[in-house]
């Protein structure tokens, strides 16, 4: 039976867990135990935080999965890419992960390729915030880049 590692076990990842099982995969799921619906639906559940890449990698070396994946989580994508790379499995590039997990880089990539996106600027500590947003209109949303 093929084995799949899924990073994350909340309500967003649970449909992925169920689909993988339906497709005949043995599911190995990593996440915090609290609030992890996937703990009940996965074949194997490991109560390890999705940011503890080395601890998960150690388990993955024992499991020897055929694939590592996630869904609906920027943070989990970072771990998936790291694990897959270390295990010699197909994975996204470092640049792809950076662009998909950094809001400013993502907006720049969208703009560069003609994908409609709201106006955006990057502002760092010490910058003149008023000048940076002077040409923007309200309502305005302020978010961290990661």
At which residue positions do the language-model features occur?
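Active-site nucleotide/adenylate-binding loops and adjacent lid/helix of ATP-dependent enzymes
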Residues: 102-146
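ATP-binding N-terminal substructure of ATP-dependent carboxylate-amine bond-forming enzymes
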Residues: 1-96, 127-130
């Amino acid at each position: 039976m093929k084995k799949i590692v899924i990073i994350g076990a909340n309500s967003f990842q649970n449909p992925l867990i169920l689909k993988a099982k339906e497709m005949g995969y043995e599911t190995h799921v990593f996440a915090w135990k609290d609030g992890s619906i996937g703990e009940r639906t996965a074949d194997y559940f490991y109560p390890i935080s999705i940011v503890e890449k080395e601890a998960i990698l150690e388990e993955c070396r024992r499991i020897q999965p055929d694939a590592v994946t996630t869904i609906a989580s920027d943070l989990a994508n970072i771990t998936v890419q790291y694990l897959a790379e270390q295990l010699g499995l197909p994975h996204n590039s470092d640049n792809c992960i950076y662009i998909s997990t950094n809001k400013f880089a993502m907006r720049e990539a969208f703009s560069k390729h003609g994908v409609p996106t709201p106006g955006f600027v990057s502002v760092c500590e010490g910058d003149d915030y008023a000048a940076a947003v002077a040409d923007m209109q309200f309502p305005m949303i302020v978010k961290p880049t990661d």
